[in-house]
Amino acid sequence: MKPLIIIVGPTAVGKTALGVALAQALQGEIISGDSVQVYRKLDIGSAKPTLAEQGNIPHYLLDALEPAEPFTVAQFQTLANQAIQDIQSRGKVPIVVGGTGLYIRSLIDPFQFAEHGSESIRSFWTAFLSEQGKEALHQELAKRDPLSAQRLHPNDTVRIIRALEMCQLTGKPFSETRGNQDLNYPPLPPSTLYVGLTAPREIIYERINRRCEQMVAAGLIEETHNLIKEGYSPKLKPLQSIGYRHALLYLYGKVTLPEMMRIFQRDTRHFAKRQLTWFRRDPRVVWYDTYSGNLTNILESLIGTCSGMESRVE
């Protein structure tokens, strides 16, 4: 069986380029592990690889959904596993590329999700928020999970609803479940290579600042405006992701363009820091520095590792 390769790391570190180069070298196909790139019409703000950047490599879970369609970790787990099996059945190498931490954990660890009930629970708490307000929602979490309530600000309603949902699905406080998932890292199968890309923080931040400027220059604000003109609600989850929510602030006159750029860059840097914290917690990740080691050297190292893995598995 062909190995499974997973490439993770913070935004702007070079995951896409390495994934495509590796796929070209190993006869691989790519599965996106990104929670926003899965949506059609959200291209610039999600840093979705263009057709040219995809390098004639088949990509899965890009442009799979309309912006108004919900997409859960459980759905990702199912669809990504189906893609992995399909790719391996044809003698190709599946390569998962992405920075959404829980998506990646759902593939390599035995996370089990309730097949029914999650959407109805979320709908209940969303309606509760509309009727009772965010303070009341936060109080409900405090009753069930004081630690999570302490950690989450009342304004962070998306995460509060997620915590309440997990409390009901698991029967345990989300803080307890979260802690167990963070600390429990079972050994990877011998056919799985878990690669992390990093760089010095100042280099990552410099790349992020430049990328944010490039996104705005490429039409991020216009892309967001077109989605609103097409009738999509600004409250949709993908439109509340980094980049799109900042463009909305500008479009609705809440901030000037320079202020939008400043907070867009700041929030993206904070997001990258959280991504690094998440992935560095996992001792199974094999790290490569994209600043001190160029792409060719990293690529050669990974090709050698994969060849050795394939020999052992066979």
Swiss-Prot record:
The residues the record assigns to binding substrate are: 11-16
Under SUPFAM superfamilies, the record lists:
P-loop containing nucleoside triphosphate hydrolases
Q: What InterPro entries does the annotation carry?
A: Dimethylallyltransferase, IPT, P-loop_NTPase
Q: What is its EC number?
A: 2.5.1.75
**Record keyword Transferase present:** yes
Cite the NCBIfam families for this sequence. Answer: miaA
Give the protein's function: Catalyzes the transfer of a dimethylallyl group onto the adenine at position 37 in tRNAs that read codons beginning with uridine, leading to the formation of N6-(dimethylallyl)adenosine (i(6)A).
Q: What PANTHER family does this protein map onto?
A: TRNA DIMETHYLALLYLTRANSFERASE
Full protein name: tRNA dimethylallyltransferase
In the UniProt record, the gene name given for this protein reads: miaA
